[in-house]
């Protein structure tokens, strides 16, 4: 199971998606943690979202659902949409710091941000 690491440095909130064993695909709990971290960043000058272990994000962790029922899928997609809406509505600049692949919903995270900075290893 992955996690979200949140740190504040020099009035910038850094959100690290920390599930490198699955290329930082996020589950419901992680998506909710990212939403909360963005909403809690009221005093920050900016928010940076990045991924651990050489990948930015592979989107939603569909394999975590096993054999999903329609309700599980609805919750994942609804929460993912809320995550993207929260990024877009944030009154502070949200920056995607991309190192490695951004695939599927990870690409959507990048597009929802105000700015994206990518290394030469990044793919979209």
Regions found by a protein language model. Name each.
Residues 30-34, 76-79, 109:
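Hydrophobic alpha-helical membrane-association signature
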Residues 15, 49, 61, 109-111:
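Hydrophobic/aromatic residues within transmembrane alpha-helices
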């Amino acid at each position: 199971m992955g996690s979200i690491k949140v740190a504040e440095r020099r009035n910038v909130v850094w959100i690290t998606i920390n599930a490198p064993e699955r290329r930082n695909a996020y589950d419901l709990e992680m998506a909710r943690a990212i939403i909360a971290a963005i909403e809690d960043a009221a005093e920050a000058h900016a928010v940076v979202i990045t991924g651990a272990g050489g990948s930015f994000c592979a989107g939603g962790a569909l394999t975590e659902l096993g054999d999903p029922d329609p309700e599980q899928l609805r919750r994942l997609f609804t929460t993912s949409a809320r995550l993207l809406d929260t990024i877009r509505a944030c009154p502070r600049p949200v920056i995607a710091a991309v190192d490695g692949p951004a695939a599927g919903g990870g690409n959507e995270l990048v597009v929802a941000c105000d700015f994206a900075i990518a290394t030469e290893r990044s793919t979209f």
